[in-house]
Amino acid sequence: MAKEHIVLFPFMSQGHIIPFLSLAKLISERHPTYTITLLNTPLNILNLQSTLPPNSNIHLKSLPYRSSDFGLPPDRENTDSLPFPLVLSFYQSGESLATHFTHFVSDLTRQNHDTPPLLIVADVFFGWTAEIAKRLNTHVSFSTCGAYGTAAYFSVWLHLPHAETDLPDFTAPGFPETFKLQRNQLSTYLKKADGSDRWSKFFQRQISLSLTSDAMICNTVEEMEAEGLRLLRKNTGLRVWSIGPLLPSLPPNSSLGRSGRKSGMEVSYIMKWLDSHPPGSVVYVSFGSIHDTAAQMTSLAVGLAVELATRSCGHSGRRFGGNRNRNSNPNGVPDEFEARMRGSGRGILIHGWAPQLEILEHESTGAFVSHCGWNSTLESLSRGVCMIGWPLAAEQFYNSKMVEEDWEWGGTCEGSGGGVRSEEVERLVRLVTEDEKGSDEENEQYDEMIGGYEEKGGEGSLSGQLIKFIGMESQ
């Protein structure tokens, strides 16, 4: 007898793998008789093995991949270990998985009494999967970003409206005239895009193919992004399901990160350090694993150092807890800054992965300086920690714009992406921590939208949305 099977295929990046893994676990809980297979490259699958309990109905399957075939360093299968100049080649290498993906789906169908998977849910960065999966009438795209950010990202890459004007701001097609984007907020490669460059060709192809899907999943909450979801549905013409927040969960005192990565510093030491500081006094800083530059990190360090130096060491003093990916530019954060923080006891710098959820949940954490990746944005909101946005690339600028202007949950560093002055960092740390952006009432509102959404019952809950999605899209 054929078994119901759902295939999940995230792009090879932690920001994509984490919500896909959360989705797999949610489906597993709600549909324990289903088999769920999560596909990826060998090293990513190896890292994920520790995240699943024994006898799980979630299977991990690796597809052959050799990074050196694409001019990349050996054993580089994730953006977290990649210098930025190689990122586009890495993105493009994903399409080499097409043959292996086709063979996997064909073998799975044959082994399951010629019954194809109930659903194939693939990353929007793997838009090419639509051509293969739709032969079986079973393809759904998954945007691991929010609805607002996804809609803006799609519009800007598909139409390149900034290339048609010299003005400092512009409107994205499909958005109201009042919706303005700033040219200086765009990443360097997007500013230069003209439709014939490699970046444009990659994103326009993957987005266009994703739009041929039967439907799309978005990692968001209907009540939180009603307008963003309306725009995304209108602009794509797809059924868009808000299945979120897909937030990771960790067992207490775990030393492993959200996708099987070990913390760069003992979690117990970090928690002890946080315990030693007053509530709301710590500024947590963490960016994504790519895009950071030495100049940006120096501005950050100087700005934080000035803010720390102008405060007493008493209750009002700010503390710094930072995370620097071990593969980032080793000259990014000045050595003297790290030494000063360590010597004064007012700061720690974590090299490698940080236990972000535990840090954000701790009462000592009062602000979060972030690149505004969507996972970090959801985690910050759900833990009631205001954000200082330092967007660097992708849809991060649109997320930061929404955090500041729509939700009033923090501020954005002026000049993000193209360089930020240290004075701007100092100003925003003071703004968020002294003015206490994010009242108790707002905290409760976002906790209800995000933190409490999964606990609700009924159709509006996360589980309810998932049941409706699987029921409709598998018909």
Curated annotation (Swiss-Prot):
UDP-alpha-D-glucose binds at residues 144, 354, 356, 371, 374-376, 379, 395-396. InterPro entries: UDP_glucos_trans. The active site is at residues 16, 123. It comes from the Eukaryota. It holds the Pfam family UDPGT. SUPFAM superfamilies: UDP-Glycosyltransferase/glycogen phosphorylase. Its EC number is 2.4.1.271. Mainly expressed in stamens. An anthocyanidin binds at residues 16, 394. It catalyses: crocetin + UDP-alpha-D-glucose = beta-D-glucosyl crocetin + UDP; beta-D-glucosyl crocetin + UDP-alpha-D-glucose = bis(beta-D-glucosyl) crocetin + UDP; beta-D-gentiobiosyl crocetin + UDP-alpha-D-glucose = beta-D-gentiobiosyl beta-D-glucosyl crocetin + UDP. GO terms for molecular function: UDP-glucosyltransferase activity. Keywords: Carotenoid biosynthesis, Glycosyltransferase, Transferase. GO terms for biological process: carotenoid biosynthetic process. Crocetin glucosyltransferase involved in the synthesis of crocin, one of the apocarotenoids responsible for the color and bitter taste of saffron. Belongs to the UDP-glycosyltransferase family. This is Crocetin glucosyltransferase 3.
